[in-house]
Amino acid sequence: MNSLARRAARGRRDGVRYALTAACAAACLSAQAGGFSIGAGAGVDHGKVDCVDGHACDRGSAHAKLFAGYALTDAIELQALAFDAGHFDGGDISPLGTPFGGRFKVNGIGIAAGYRWTFAPGWSLKGQLGVARVRTRFGYAAPFAGDASMTTTQPLVGLSLGYQIAPQWRLSLDVDETRFKVHTTRGPLRMVGVAAQFAF
């Protein structure tokens, strides 16, 4: 009887242990599934390009971005993003002193870590810091032909004011800033727009 009782007690303990392990695994999987998000945004941007006489000059454009995030905690999030900053018209001066004009096309990919502060029900403010690989392609205007491109690693900073419209949906007003470079032209790129984010 004692042996049977011990085996029964051991079986109950094992059952409890297995149940706790299964519950913990389910909770971990649930937490992981709830930590991922995807989103998209669009808006206007401004790129600092040099202007030369006789050629078009336009420092404003439109941008679009796609991003995916993973929330380590309710406040800390990792994000990977890709963006197309459109194009800017400007120019430069060759090493021999010859001015030339053309069009700058800028895009890139980046990673960042952010901290989200919830300051009111549904409202939050997030700041993030990371790095981006920014590609700038310059197409020469007549009378020249051809193009040149350069890819550089640049800092990436962002600020986002968000509102939780539903448990899985967030709308935000985003400001992202990085830099771009080609030839001797280098300067900041600022993107301002709205974004929608879906968590799953």
Could you tell me what each predicted segment is?
Residues 1-35:
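Cleavable N-terminal export/targeting peptides
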Residues 34, 41-48, 65-141, 163, ...:
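Gram-negative (and chloroplast) outer-membrane scaffold detector with strong preference
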Residues 175-182:
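Low-complexity, intrinsically disordered Gly/Pro/Thr-rich segments
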Residues 156-162, 172, 195:
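Outer membrane beta-barrel transmembrane domains
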